A protein has these predicted regions:
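Solvent-exposed, charged interface segments at domain starts and junctions
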Residues: 90-95, 161-162, 167-176, 256-262
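Active-site catalytic motif of lipid deacylating hydrolases and related acyltransferases
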Residues: 17-18, 32, 48-164
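Serine-dependent carboxylesterase/thioesterase catalytic core
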Residues: 4, 8-36, 134-242
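Aromatic side chains
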Residues: 59-60, 140, 181, 310-312
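Glycine-rich loops and low-complexity Gly/Arg-rich segments
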Residues: 34-39, 80-85, 194-196, 230-234, ...
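Conserved, well-structured beta-alpha core segment at the onset of a catalytic domain
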Residues: 1-72, 325-331
C-alpha cells in the first residue's frame, strides 16, 4: 500500500567542500540512507524509491572560491566505496551499531579490526581533513559574502519545505552542522522580513554527524555567541529533537558529548517539547567502515576515514529514527 509522504522532507547538508558534483552527492546520500532504512523497513524503502522528492540536498560546495568538483573517474570509485559500506550494513544488520553498554574494544575486535591500529590510522588522514576544515571555517568566519552563499541553499530548502506544509528533518555532516545551527538560529530569532514569517516554524529532527560544534572555537563563530546572556537567544528554539552521532577516531567530532554544552541547558530552558523521551541523544564511539578512494598520494596510508559521511549515513539508529519519522511514529 502506497505511503503518503507528501508532508515529509529530509534535507541533507554536506561537510567539507571538496565534493562530487551536486547531483552525484545527492544520489550517494539518498542511496545510503534508503538502503540503511531498507534493512529494517523494506516496504518503506520501496515507497522512498517511488518518492525521491522526499530527499533534498542543500549543496554549498560551489560557494567556496575555486571549487572544482571531483571528476567522473573519482566519483565512480567513490560509488564503489559507498557500496561497500552499504554491503556491510546489510550483512551484519544492527550489529553495525556499537551498543551503549558494549565494550568498544570488543566490538572492533569481533569485526577483525585492531582498535589501536584503527585510531592510529585515523591520525594519518587527520592533516588532510583538518587542513580543509580549518580553511573553510576561516572563510565562513571572515567573508560574510561567502558565508551567506554557504547558508543560502539550506535557507531556501527550509523555506520551501515550510511553505509546502512539510515537516522537515535536517541531516548535517561536519561543517554542515554548524552552518545548519546558524541557519536554524536565524529562523528562530531574526525579525527581518525573510525570517520573521518562519519564527514559529520547527524542524522535527536535527541530526548532527561528525560535528565540530563541541569545539569552543567553532561555537565562537556562530550568531548565538553574541547572545550568551540572553537566555532563549543562546540557542535555536525551533528544534524538536536533536540527535548527535560521533564515530570512533573522527578527528572533527572528538568532542563527542553535547549533553553539557547544548542538551542540558536547552532542556532547562524548555526548548524541547515537554514530557517526551529521546528528544536529545548522543551516540558516541560508533563504527565507520568507510575506506577512502585510493590514489597516487595515499597508496601506502591507512585507508579508513572515520569522519566520512557515508559511514554515518549507514548508522542503524539513524535508519530507525528516520523510519519512525516517515511512518509518523515520533511521539
Amino acid at each position: 500500500m502506497p505511503l503518503d509522504l507528501s508532508n515529509k522532507r529530509i534535507i541533507m547538508i554536506h561537510g567539507l567542500a571538496s565534493k562530487p558534483p551536486a547531483d552525484v552527492t545527492h544520489e550517494l546520500w539518498r542511496k545510503t540512507l534508503t538502503e540503511n532504512i531498507r534493512v529494517g523497513h523494506r516496504q518503506l524503502a520501496k515507497n522512498l524509491d517511488a518518492n525521491p522528492q522526499v530527499f533534498e540536498t542543500a549543496y554549498w560546495a560551489d560557494a567556496v572560491p575555486h571549487h572544482i568538483p571531483d571528476d567522473a573517474a573519482y566519483c565512480r570509485k567513490l560509488a564503489l566505496q559507498v557500496d561497500k559500506v552499504i554491503a556491510e550494513r546489510r550483512e551484519i544488520k544492527d550489529r553495525f551499531h556499537v551498543g551503549m553498554g558494549e565494550k568498544v574494544g570488543s566490538f572492533f575486535k569481533d569485526r577483525g579490526l585492531d582498535l589501536v591500529k584503527l585510531l592510529a590510522g585515523a591520525l594519518t588522514v587527520k592533516d588532510d581533513v583538518m587542513t580543509s576544515f580549518l580553511r573553510e571555517t576561516e572563510l565562513y568566519d571572515q567573508d560574510q559574502y561567502i558565508a551567506d552563499r554557504i547558508r543560502a541553499p539550506l535557507e531556501s530548502a527550509l523555506r520551501r519545505a515550510w511553505d509546502e506544509g512539510r515537516e522537515p528533518v535536517i541531516l548535517a555532516h561536519s561543517m554542515g552542522s554548524f552552518v545548519s545551527y546558524d541557519v536554524l538560529w536565524r529562523f528562530a530569532h531574526r525579525k527581518t522580513a525573510d525570517f520573521k514569517k518562519y519564527n514559529g516554524k520547527r524542524v522535527r529532527m536535527f541530526v548532527t554527524l561528525g560535528s565540530p560544534l563541541g569545539e569552543p572555537s567553532v561555537r565562537n563563530l556562530l550568531f548565538a555567541t553574541h547572545h550568551q546572556d540572553h537566555s532563549l537567544r543562546q540557542f535555536p528554539t525551533n528544534i524538536e529533537r536533536w540527535h548527535n552521532y560521533a564515530c570512533l577516531g573522527d578527528v572533527v567530532s572528538h568532542q563527542k558529548n553535547f549533553h553539557d554544552i547544548f542538551f542540558q541547558p536547552m532542556r532547562k530552558l524548555q526548548l524541547f517539547p515537554a514530557n517526551k523521551n529521546f528528544r536529545s541523544i548522543d551516540y558516541a564511539d560508533l563504527h565507520n567502515p568507510f575506506e577512502v578512494v585510493t590514489h597516487a598520494g595515499n597508496r601506502n596510508r591507512e585507508k579508513r576515514n572515520p569522519h566520512k559521511s557515508y559511514g554515518y549515513l549507514a548508522q542503524p539508529r539513524l535508519g530507525s529514527w528516520l523510519a519512525d519519522y516517515l511512518l509518523d511514529r515520533l511521539l
